[in-house]
């Protein structure tokens, strides 16, 4: 059964948050009681994603399989490819008071992201994001809702003629979202603060072999399509890639406190954002575990507001946002929803799904 959407408003925010944290408390014996770092013991993590389900995202110890993205018979409803990524992280930078202006959470991989990838690609309930379809909406406590038409977030078949893009905010260093979800979109722009970008680029390049369905071009990563067949290396020749479409993949600095898309001069500083508008008909903004203290909420929501206005008015894009939150502070979650709905006038839906409700995470769709 597909997930449902609960339309939140200024009255139902509190009912939703109370119910979700009550669920969380009832599962305290089953769920890890930690801050959510994927693995704080190692500098390099080996992670496998596979169709066997949400357990596929567990870290694999002492395994170094390279370029092992495999596929079986295609299925429109659930992804069939497997992926293995190697993620270099920096525990020392996480603990540093000097690195990246003391904003250091992005130096490690947080567990919200692997969970989201597994759910999006392999959970049957996430099918609307893979197929593009109408989703049932419940308004408050009433069972009489309506349907919301969702464009595809990812196209598993490659047959959809629509051009789709992903803009990732607060990407951190891992780079696993672009190298996996990049297989199913046309343009992917991964952003974070400037101090994070070198390690983010390193991890993307380390795992570029997982982009098995696309030919990748990138100005920021200095990747171009091959034009001449290299002797003795048939695996990467242009002739060997005739059936693959092209992914535009870029990595860019985006400071939520400084962005000003109303200033025309700013546009020239963010050509990657213009790339999404120029190449896509729909865009999903993805932000995983970026709301963990109250100080980030206003800059984040102001950035979303600017992006929505600019991409819709300038390029007429379909615009949706997916925010993943690791449920830590009930007060921070409540404040985020209050500000998003009441102060910034966003339409916010809780994604209601059993798999999510049995985890420490929650996902919100914002339009």
From Swiss-Prot:
It comes from the Eukaryota. Keywords: Methyltransferase, S-adenosyl-L-methionine, Transferase. Its EC number is 2.1.1.-. It is an enzyme of class 2 (transferase). One of its GO terms (cellular component) is cytosol. InterPro entries: Methyltransf_16, SAM-dependent_MTases_sf. The keyword Transport does not apply. GO terms for biological process: methylation. One of its GO terms (molecular function) is S-adenosylmethionine-dependent methyltransferase activity. S-adenosyl-L-methionine binds at residues 110, 170-172, 192, 256, 288. PANTHER family: HEPATOCELLULAR CARCINOMA-ASSOCIATED ANTIGEN, RIBOSOMAL LYSINE N-METHYLTRANSFERASE 5. Belongs to the class I-like SAM-binding methyltransferase superfamily. RKM5 family. S-adenosyl-L-methionine-dependent protein-lysine N-methyltransferase that monomethylates 60S ribosomal protein L1 (RPL1A and RPL1B) at 'Lys-46'. Present with 468 molecules/cell in log phase SD medium. This is Ribosomal lysine N-methyltransferase 5.
